[in-house]
Amino acid sequence: MSVRVKVCGVTRLSDAVAAWEAGVDALGLNFYPKSPRYLDLPTAAALARTRPPLGTVLGVFVNAAPDTIRETVRACGLTAVQLHGDEPPEACSGYGVPVIKALRVTGPEDVVRARTYVGVGDVAGLLLDGAAPGYGGGGVGFDWSLVAGLAGSGVPVLVAGGLRPSNVAEAVRATRPYGVDVASGVESAPGIKDVEAVRAFVRAAKSINLWE
């Protein structure tokens, strides 16, 4: 079995199509207004329509109002929600789709905090990211050994932060995650994906057999 790959911050139709063709399992569409990868609803809906039958399209939100999230899920046909802000456990349900809760990691205390989301509401997975300024997409990594703190939690874990084609295989070997997530590590500019880098990232990530 190989790791799942999510490419976040897609803004162009051609990049979305190329990512699916490269073997990506999920795309993240950014609805955080302060992000350089922010999308309006018509653009996001068009990108979501590129989804193949077994693909996942997540909407990425930062401290957004629940009604805004629900409206966006309906308008764009999202299949999951990623909460990437300071949302408490009680905010992780009520959107009609599974929730991935992202948490910035600087030390063991953040992994302890991550465990408070396990089994709560509609949380279907946890995404551990580096603590870059702002919320995500900063290309900052974290100590991969901390992922072991979620061993036995029963919740799928995705690793993000500072990943790129040259180090993602190492990250998969070190953490044995359910998935890996990349944004800036496969870009030529914020929101502009380098298709060759996406292909190389997918090849490297999926070259590791998680059952070995």
Swiss-Prot record:
GO molecular function annotation: phosphoribosylanthranilate isomerase activity
Key word Ion transport present: no
Family as reported in the entry's similarity comment: Belongs to the TrpF family.
Single GO biological process annotation from the record: L-tryptophan biosynthetic process
Catalytically driven reaction(s): N-(5-phospho-beta-D-ribosyl)anthranilate = 1-(2-carboxyphenylamino)-1-deoxy-D-ribulose 5-phosphate
EC code: 5.3.1.24
InterPro entries assigned to the protein according to its UniProt record, in alphabetical order: Aldolase_TIM, PRAI_dom, RibuloseP-bd_barrel, TrpF_fam
EC category: isomerase
Origin superkingdom: Bacteria
Official protein name in the record: N-(5'-phosphoribosyl)anthranilate isomerase
Pfam families per the UniProt record, alphabetical: PRAI
Lineage: Bacteria, Pseudomonadati, Myxococcota, Myxococcia, Myxococcales
Key words, A-Z: Amino-acid biosynthesis, Aromatic amino acid biosynthesis, Isomerase, Tryptophan biosynthesis
Pathway(s) annotated for this protein in UniProt: Amino-acid biosynthesis; L-tryptophan biosynthesis; L-tryptophan from chorismate: step 3/5
